[in-house]
Amino acid sequence: MRLSKAPPADRFDAVPAASDRPGRGAVRAWLYLLAVLVVAMVAVGGATRLTGSGLSITEWRPVTGVVPPLNAADWAVEFDKYRDTPQYRILNQGIGLDGFKTLYWWEWGHRLLGRIVGLVFFLPFAWFWWRGWLGRRLLLGLLGLGLLGGLQGAIGWIMVASGLQPGMTAVAPLKLALHLTTASLILAGLVWLAAGTRALALAPAPEPVRRVAGLLPVLVLIQIWLGGLVAGSKAGLLYNTWPDMDGMLVPPARMLFDKVPFIENFVDNLALVQFNHRLFAYLVVLVALAHAVQAVRMAPGAAAGRAMGVAALTLAQMGLGIVTLLLQVPLWAGLAHQVFAMAVLIMATVHARLSVGVPAASAPTGAAVPIGLEALAGRGV
């Protein structure tokens, strides 16, 4: 009698997955394209913030706003609108038309990219739905992300409007953090759905590994929220030393909680805002490192490789954050720190989704080599 050894469940030679349906490859490529576009949105949005360009367009015109000023008269009208803003009167008085155009193009480009993302989402979505290429779970997930994307556009305008109020020279930090976190949540949702459409089945990781893997994207999203508060309040410019904060490892309570009511300290007290972002970064790194050790012991192979990848990225992101702080947030470092946070979130989300496992199809239908970001972690993911 000849014995055969079953292939490991986390290898590419596993049985086809239940998600291996017609059009799977096209749907997956589309989801990853959307993820790339969202990262580009975050990058352009970060540059718009860091260059102080976010308040240069004072109206929200979802359709007609796609057309920029086309002649000198159009530019004069837009410039006059900007000169009525508090930001111009308080910070940018005397800026010339050429300087205004630089600000305008950043904000216009950010909004244009948002419209492009909407088109790239809804047109293929309608086609895939009509062709029957979207399973029920995937369809519901995409509908949810579509609604969240529409809400994100509204959040973006509410954020801009907050910066146009009397006495304001920038958008409200709380609204900026919400805008950034919502974009990050959309990105995580796209990557989660894409990773679940792999062609081949995958056995779930042990339950303890799954639990911590699922926790990591949540922690990263919280840290992105805290980073949004730092960015919106410019708290990163307050203490530019590390590991101390101008000689203090932990600032005294009277510095951290001097606002009334108490809850306002978590948004308006710049010392506490920066301290929270630092402290939570340490927590994320410690959890990622501990999880990598856990995965190596309990799930050697692909899951362990992914966990070590998450740990390495979180360490690199913390190092980049420290450099950004010490250099007093130059544009390149602040932008790199924001975009690299998206890389950490993508890797953590892929790891969490694949740790859940991908069920096998009831009957094999032929397999294709998976594509997508999860393949970057190495064979067997």
Swiss-Prot record:
InterPro entries: COX15/CtaA_fam, HemeA_Synthase_type2. Its main location: membrane. Heme binds at residues 277, 337. Its cofactor is heme b. Disulfide bonds: none annotated. The keyword Methyltransferase does not apply. It is an enzyme of class 1 (oxidoreductase). It is a multi-pass membrane protein. The chain crosses the membrane at residues 25-45, 112-132, 138-158, 176-196, 212-232, 279-299, 307-327, 329-349. GO terms for molecular function: metal ion binding; oxidoreductase activity, acting on NAD(P)H, heme protein as acceptor. It catalyses: Fe(II)-heme o + 2 A + H2O = Fe(II)-heme a + 2 AH2. Pfam families: COX15-CtaA. Its EC number is 1.17.99.9. The keyword Iron applies. It is found in: Cell membrane. GO terms for cellular component: plasma membrane. Keywords: Cell membrane, Heme biosynthesis, Iron, Membrane, Metal-binding, Oxidoreductase, Transmembrane, Transmembrane helix. Coiled coil: none annotated. GO terms for biological process: heme A biosynthetic process. Pathway: Porphyrin-containing compound metabolism; heme A biosynthesis; heme A from heme O: step 1/1. Catalyzes the conversion of heme O to heme A by two successive hydroxylations of the methyl group at C8. The first hydroxylation forms heme I, the second hydroxylation results in an unstable dihydroxymethyl group, which spontaneously dehydrates, resulting in the formyl group of heme A. Belongs to the COX15/CtaA family. Type 2 subfamily. Interacts with CtaB. This is Heme A synthase. It comes from Methylorubrum populi (strain ATCC BAA-705 / NCIMB 13946 / BJ001) (Methylobacterium populi).
